[in-house]
Amino acid sequence: MSRVSQARNLGKYFLLIDNMLVVLGFFVVFPLISIRFVDQMGWAAVMVGIALGLRQFIQQGLGIFGGAIADRFGAKPMIVTGMLMRAAGFATMGIAHEPWLLWFSCLLSGLGGTLFDPPRSALVVKLIRPQQRGRFFSLLMMQDSASAVIGALLGSWLLQYDFRLVCATGAVLFVLCAAFNAWLLPAWKLSTVRTPVREGMTRVMRDKRFVTYVLTLAGYYMLAVQVMLMLPIMVNDVAGAPSAVKWMYAIEACLSLTLLYPIARWSEKHFRLEHRLMAGLLIMSLSMMPVGMVSGLQQLFTLICLFYIGSIIAEPARETLSASLADARARGSYMGFSRLGLAIGGAIGYIGGGWLFDLGKSAHQPELPWMMLGIIGIFTFLALGWQFSQKRAARRLLERDA
């Protein structure tokens, strides 16, 4: 076995262990933020939505800068620094009794993610061969789901004692992850050349097709982020107990572990990436519309099942499509910019979703936020369809001219 092949194989195991620690640390804390501050402390959902949206926007919106810096200086220093910064954010969150302190803790957490997330994504693109990426992204999603459930279960159990224990556990996991990277991650370059920060960012911004695709995905993320805000609140309201939230993540884990890899293997043989992304988005949109009209936990979990199935279909295709569009000369910059759709969509989804949830509750129209999210998903579906049809038309024109 060549040294390159050996490095790729070892890199896969490193990425899986690293991903497990990151997801565990994140899901111990973040699914319980809305339960802690909305249900236990009585804050308005929009106040918590601002905090979650701020974290999302900072982490993903500034990702292009984190990715460009990683292109210049390498992945290791960015990842270690970012994980320690997130640990500090979680520690601060444990003592948050005023909105500004919660917002500050989410700001720290988001800045940490800005540093470690793009280089981690670029390492996947660097180490995994193009023909294997779809299956590897599916494995990562399966691991995400299992780790999310374990994290949510652990966080829910700790929450009955003290929210500070929840935050301390998340902080410790990120410190461990930082130590793991500092000890074992080689000083790998992310790109084929050591690209200056400004050049990497300029290369991305000139790629109009990639920029349009990323910005359109904001609508997709407005739906996806509700697993952190409105869906946990809805489950808690219907069930009458915060402990029911863990079953929402258990459903996701069961579906992912049983369906994600088989669906990915089968669909990659029969359907294009863009068709898989659009089909998953359509299922997510349609399953979200009736959520505000249900009154029983069984009905709610059925809709959540459909939502997760849509995500299972869409997410590996989205990740693979984003990676396939990245320029090898500026991988960090491309993977950082690819998070901008999540930054915009996540911020609007959290803040707008929280505001609509409060508005619907005060106006006795609980279906309002869910119908609006479903409509946004349908419009995003149509916009992606138009983009992909334009791309196919341009390809046919080039083939005819040739």
Swiss-Prot record:
InterPro entries: MFS, MFS_dom, MFS_trans_sf, MFS_Transporters, Multidrug-R_MdtH. Keywords: Cell inner membrane, Cell membrane, Membrane, Transmembrane, Transmembrane helix, Transport. It is a multi-pass membrane protein. One of its GO terms (cellular component) is plasma membrane. PROSITE patterns: MFS. GO terms for molecular function: transmembrane transporter activity. Residues 34-98, 160-164, 235-243, 298-299, 361-367 are periplasmic. Residues 1-12, 117-138, 186-213, 265-276, 321-339, 389-402 are cytoplasmic. NCBIfam families: PRK11646.1. This is Multidrug resistance protein MdtH. It comes from Shigella flexneri. The lineage of its organism: Bacteria, Pseudomonadati, Pseudomonadota, Gammaproteobacteria, Enterobacterales. The gene is mdtH.
